[in-house]
Swiss-Prot record:
Record-linked Pfam families: Ribosom_S12_S23 (PF00164)
Domain of life according to the entry: Bacteria
Record-linked CDD domains: Ribosomal_S12
Protein name (Swiss-Prot/TrEMBL): Small ribosomal subunit protein uS12
Gene3D superfamilies: Nucleic acid-binding proteins
Any one of the GO CC terms: small ribosomal subunit
Organism (species): Bifidobacterium longum (strain NCC 2705)
GO biological process: translation
Family: Belongs to the universal ribosomal protein uS12 family.
Functional note: With S4 and S5 plays an important role in translational accuracy.
NCBIfam families: rpsL_bact (TIGR00981)
Amino acid sequence: MPTIEQLVRKGRQAKPKKSKTLALKGSPLRRGVCTRVYTTTPKKPNSALRKVARVRLSSGIEVTAYIPGEGHNLQEHSIVLVRGGRVKDLPGVRYHIVRGALDTQGVKDRKQGRSLYGAKKAK
């Protein structure tokens, strides 16, 4: 236990915060290529077929990324933009694919909350 005098001189060293999105290497977004597009089931108590993709990032790391929204046009070799953000009921999925960027189309017929889904304003 340090004395008050030692604390005045040295102070406490803050522990560095651990990143939850290591594969992005400090970037907000990373480009990648889909190596496999498939569906998977969430953990209990939820039930669905969640759309996910294995993506090889430009940083050289392969990650599993969630495809948000209803319907998508992704297939193997599609170029996608990946952001951080986990999916709580899918273990190991810590990244999201950005809709409306690169090869990923926005969600069709989306009227509300369009920004996250790359949907243009309906005229």
